[in-house]
Amino acid sequence: MARISHQGAAKPFTAWTTIFYLLLVFIAPLAFFGTAHAQDETSPQESYGTVIGIDLGTTYSCVGVMQNGKVEILVNDQGNRITPSYVAFTDEERLVGDAAKNQYAANPRRTIFDIKRLIGRKFDDKDVQKDAKHFPYKVVNKDGKPHVKVDVNQTPKTLTPEEVSAMVLGKMKEIAEGYLGKKVTHAVVTVPAYFNDAQRQATKDAGTIAGLNVLRVVNEPTAAAIAYGLDKTGDERQVIVYDLGGGTFDVSLLSIDNGVFEVLATAGDTHLGGEDFDQRVMDHFVKLYNKKNNVDVTKDLKAMGKLKREVEKAKRTLSSQMSTRIEIEAFHNGEDFSETLTRAKFEELNMDLFKKTLKPVEQVLKDAKVKKSEVDDIVLVGGSTRIPKVQALLEEFFGGKKASKGINPDEAVAFGAAVQGGVLSGEEGTGDVVLMDVNPLTLGIETTGGVMTKLIPRNTVIPTRKSQIFSTAADNQPTVLIQVYEGERSLTKDNNLLGKFELTGIPPAPRGVPQIEVSFDLDANGILKVHASDKGTGKAESITITNDKGRLSQEEIDRMVAEAEEFAEEDKAIKAKIEARNTLENYAFSLKNQVNDENGLGGQIDEDDKQTILDAVKEVTEWLEDNAATATTEDFEEQKEQLSNVAYPITSKLYGSAPADEDDEPSGHDEL
């Protein structure tokens, strides 16, 4: 998943808060993942059999398989290498793929498509509501989730998006079994980089319904990059994956270094793709037809279905020809339709949408702080990237740099998924192929109070690289101890220690001042290198943790996950108590420092007020020494409120501000 730099943006806070709160705590983010190399997965591979790779697309899906070191993109029963993600119900049967799409014009209300726009979402999601208005089929609310309501055998039936997606996945499974001549039970399935956990899990559930064990849910841009073989390049490369499909647009910027993939930034538009280009052309011709014939053809769903089909064909033709003719017999009220569409007119109708695709490209470069000139490769994914003007605009944006065109853009994602499927199934010839695995447990680092500061959730795609700025927890602290843990519990004592090391020689400075950059780099062989450096002195230390050192068995992983659920409430309470104590200590420390600063607040209040605040701070400090071990969360919060009640009347005379609310405290770094 994406690389995230947790430099939390400070929330707006008042002048009073500005005076009394320092940047005191730091986050210690470090993560470690499980093994990613095929050779490390021995026994499980034996039961996988052939693992297929499926690109489950919004408008089209594609399936591939790796055999003897070679990837085959498989053809369906119509001889096509891509299959429409369509499901339809007639009075006699259920249709999936080409057959479903081909009868769409005659049966629009019972033909389901674009189900990927609904999967894993809630019914009241604004995107779902927007889409539902344009679908010819009915989308209904059931338990807060969108369901499709259609007539099946003349009986109303409600289907979940997972069930519909399962029908498409089942078709891809059937295609693979027809090619291989044997049963297929395992698959790698791809999803857009912006899919959240719910959407990913729903996709896996769809696989289960289809009789497939989805071993991996892989990000589409990463699969596409593998398809282009960029992972075999030794030097670090910055790669733009530009994925313009039928219904969605996704841009990702990846850094690839010796097989380690790092998604630096992702942007896109969930409602921009080939269908939108088709709609522009349809709107143009509908306007012409209505004007010529003095009718409103949009009310004729079957006529609109015919036009949709022919416009898509015309668009494809214009990628290789300068003009094409659209002919539809008995289009509306027995009248035929006949119009010419030139490439120039097609580009004119869609130029604003084509240019709109460059905004996410600019966004990912800006987010990752990468210049256009630093991009090494441009990878095209999705059938809409065949449009000449789209390619021209993108290449012009990058100063004339040519996009990679080594693989059919319709097939790039499925190709990469098939490579990973081949690795998982232990196919001959995949010894040098690296698989991006997922970490089996959450990984993080210990911070003040023994808290497990979680950085990487379990089931995050690897390889990856992370880095973060840390600081010290005490004045003049000469050493920081970095302890890497894995597990699902809130306290590190309940998790598994993977390794630790110290960074020493930190020059004397107040707490929170030193800047210590900690980075970790997990390669494809499951070897983690943790590196810490003091940005002030340049001094650095590192540790290497291999995949067989301190790792848990599957049984232990299962037990820890179960325990995490069982003790979730207990963990939550303990963590809240530690956080309440840290908040009180930090507040008292900040208050004392500000009052003693003669160039700041200390020079603006009289001695009596200063002593009043210092006495209150001393009282809290003594209370902490006597009661911290046994106090409750509420006790710590009460002490903080009492201290605030002493300080606020004094400071409000200076600033006239409202009291600081806990939500106004600046976000900072957890303390080690």
From Swiss-Prot:
Signal peptide: 1-38
CDD domains in alphabetical order: ASKHA_NBD_HSP70_BiP
Catalytic activity as recorded in UniProt: ATP + H2O = ADP + phosphate + H(+)
Protein's UniProt keywords contain Amino-acid biosynthesis: no
Keyword list, A-Z: ATP-binding, Chaperone, Endoplasmic reticulum, Hydrolase, Nucleotide-binding, Signal, Stress response
Organism field: Aspergillus niger
Protein's cellular compartments: Endoplasmic reticulum lumen
Regulation: The chaperone activity is regulated by ATP-induced allosteric coupling of the nucleotide-binding (NBD) and substrate-binding (SBD) domains. In the ADP-bound and nucleotide-free (apo) states, the two domains have little interaction. In contrast, in the ATP-bound state the two domains are tightly coupled, which results in drastically accelerated kinetics in both binding and release of polypeptide substrates. J domain-containing co-chaperones stimulate the ATPase activity and are required for efficient substrate recognition.
Function: Probably plays a role in facilitating the assembly of multimeric protein complexes inside the ER. Is required for secretory polypeptide translocation. May physically associate with SEC63 protein in the endoplasmic reticulum and this interaction may be regulated by ATP hydrolysis.
SUPFAM superfamilies: Actin-like ATPase domain, Heat shock protein 70kD (HSP70), C-terminal subdomain, Heat shock protein 70kD (HSP70), peptide-binding domain
Motif (Prevents secretion from ER): 669-672
Enzyme Commission (EC) number: 3.6.4.10
Protein name listed in UniProt: Endoplasmic reticulum chaperone BiP
NCBIfam families found in the cross-reference section: PRK00290.1 (NF001413)
Inducing or repressing factors: By heat shock and tunicamycin. Not induced by carbon source starvation.
Predominant localisation class: endoplasmic reticulum
